[in-house]
Amino acid sequence: MKFAVAIAFTLLVCVFAQEEEEPVTCGGKQCKPNSCCVQNSHGKGKDSPRCHPLGKLNNPCEVEPNENGIYSQHCPCGEGLSCTKVGEPNKLRCQEESGKSDKSKESQGSDESEESEESKESSG
């Protein structure tokens, strides 16, 4: 019985691992994790699709691929970054997600408010 449970658990872990990151097929090749498929449609002729790494801080980025899952110029941003309009003329760039820094400030603020409530209770 324990053996059957162990096998079931192992299969479940494998299924979840595969669901997390599907490899991207691009121009007949599979892209590595943390990359996307880009096909530059500008210029004299269309380039063949190629794998590119996900955007890093301040890199140009795109949010939506076309119907085939291919981006026209740039990959979306990597983990912890969001594609945000920056400067003039509002170009999209990878920026740190505002939620992360706000959350850390919020947690600091809640800690401070808890401390002040505790000090009121002990003094009052």
From Swiss-Prot:
The keyword Signal applies. Residues 93-124 are annotated as: Disordered. One of its GO terms (molecular function) is toxin activity. Residues 1-17 form the signal peptide. Residues 93-108 have a biased composition (Basic and acidic residues). Disulfide bonds join C26-C37, C31-C51, C36-C75, C61-C83, C77-C94. Residues 109-118 have a biased composition (Acidic residues). Belongs to the neurotoxin 32 family. Consists of two fundamental structural elements: a disulfide-directed beta-hairpin motif (DDH) and a disulfide-stabilized antiparallel beta-hairpin stack (DABS), which are covalently linked together. This is U33-theraphotoxin-Cg1c. It comes from Chilobrachys guangxiensis (Chinese earth tiger tarantula).
